[in-house]
A protein has these predicted regions:
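Structural signature of nuclease core domains in nucleic-acid processing machines
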Residues: 1-94
Length: 94
């Protein structure tokens, strides 16, 4: 991993478990997939990959809020944090 700020999300020595393309059914009964969910001892991170040129997180806020809500119901006693990871390695927490 060339981006040090991302290493803890992809190096298994740093997290408890990780899941790619994790499916869940939202409140409307739609099947959705979270790009990567990473479980640490004290928190869970929902990561979504973006390949566009813009680093503006605004267009993705509703999507990430939905992911956070869905995962907060699963990990009720754990902090759920969300971030976008752009193709250039930039991490934008939402």
């Amino acid at each position: 991993m060339k981006q040090p700020q991302l290493q803890r999300f992809f190096d298994a020595a740093h997290y408890r478990s990780a899941h790619n393309e994790m499916p869940y059914v939202n409140a409307r009964g739609e099947l959705k997939r979270i790009d990567r969910l990473v479980e640490f001892d004290s928190e869970v991170w929902v990561l979504d990959y973006k390949t566009g040129a813009s680093h503006d997180p605004a267009p993705y806020r509703a999507q990430m809020n939905e992911y956070r809500g869905a995962m907060q119901s699963v990990y009720a006693d754990t902090t759920v944090r969300c971030a976008l990871i752009f193709s250039d390695g930039m991490l934008s927490e939402m």
